[in-house]
Regions:
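C-terminal catalytic "cap/lid" subdomain
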Residues: 1-227
Length: 227
């Protein structure tokens, strides 16, 4: 069984590296890997605070900032975070960091760690491509929000949480264009590809590891299912 987890950079490095979270996340991964020899994880790591800070600095310095350059800055931040996650996985992860989801060697270990790829492709999109490549049933997208809402709850107090939504309706909420650093629950370009291949995505709060355990066990959980 291959499970793809897209781990938002805001969870790994909200302002600095969250060491306590990573220790607890490693413990949870170890729990499932030791319990089930057939269980394998693909972890796709986002850029978090380093990506946003360096991208904003670029835009502040260059009024005519080019999206492609901002994207490359974010990609390098994902690679730094992903290399850290790969290192802490130790012997569970025997393969090099995946930087191109279209050129992945056969999955020979128990954990595979991936980072950003190239401009125009978010780590969400990488997660979808890897799920397609290794025939995962779904992607678990962990970020700093518990669920997808009808609107931004920080700006609209009447925004309602959504338990389940179709890809078509989800794209109406987010728009269909990818902009580097855009703050949406799941990248619109990745969403279109997921819809095309019939992939389910579960959006949930990354810090709530008890909730992640429930998702992995197939139990009732707090989050949003997009399919």
């Amino acid at each position: 069984m291959v499970t793809v987890i897209s781990l938002g950079g805001s969870i790994v490095a909200p302002d600095k590296v969250d060491e306590d979270f990573l220790k607890n996340f490693l413990s949870l991964m170890r729990e499932f890997l030791e319990k089930d020899e057939k269980r394998r994880f693909i972890l796709v790591i986002g850029g978090g605070s380093p990506a946003r800070i360096w991208q904003q600095a670029y835009r502040n310095i260059c009024p005519k900032a080019v999206n492609e350059q901002a994207d490359w800055i974010g990609i390098m931040a994902t690679r730094l975070n992903a290399q850290l996650v790969r290192a802490i996985m130790g012997d569970w992860c025997v393969q090099d960091l995946v930087i191109d989801p279209t050129k992945v060697e056969p999955f020979i270990g128990r954990v595979l760690v991936a980072s950003g790829w190239k401009p125009g492709f978010s780590t969400d999109h990488d997660a979808v491509l890897l799920a397609e490549r290794f025939k995962a049933d779904y992607v678990i997208n962990l970020s700093n929000i518990e669920q997808v809402y009808t609107d931004d709850p920080k700006k609209n107090s009447e925004a309602k949480p959504i338990d389940k939504i179709s890809w078509q309706d989800f794209l109406k909420l987010t728009g269909e264009e990818w902009i580097p650093g855009k703050n949406v629950p799941f990248d619109p370009v990745a969403s279109r590809h997921a819809a095309k291949i019939g992939l389910k995505v579960i959006c949930a709060a990354g810090k709530n590891l008890d909730n992640l355990r429930k998702i992995l066990l197939g139990e009732s959980f707090l989050g949003t299912i997009i399919s």
